[in-house]
Amino acid sequence: MKITISREDFNKIYEHALSVRPEEACGLIAGEDRDSGIRVIEKVYILTNTDHTNEHFTIDPKEQLTAIKDMRANGLKPLGNWHSHPESPSRPSEEDKKLANDSKASYLILSLMEEGNPVLNAFHIELKNGEKTVRKEELLII
């Protein structure tokens, strides 16, 4: 699947991730799936990582509920989540794979490993034959 995110939303995620580093930053993504097969991110939600650690994240449940209500009020579809890896590459960790339970979701991971060179990738994670499989999705910053 091809996914698009605006430069403005990319910058919003990046700036927040820098502001909470060395902790992982996290949030949700919302938008629409177009008939053309393109997933369009129309809004990103910056949410609190209640774990306050650089190794994993848990989204604040109250903030998550507020974000879901906002999506519904604005006619947006929940598309998945995003989080940062302050000290590791932009790919799902074993923990990320273990916690990925929505086969329809896109998982965006922003690496801050290389100073001044943020790397954002999108992934699809699903259970196949008893194992979690990861597929990189095409992500366009427009």
Identify the function of each model-found stretch:
Residues 1-78, 87-142:
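Conserved beta-strand-loop surface patch within small alpha/beta domains used
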Residues 84:
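Short, well-ordered beta-to-alpha junction loops that form the rim of enzyme active sites
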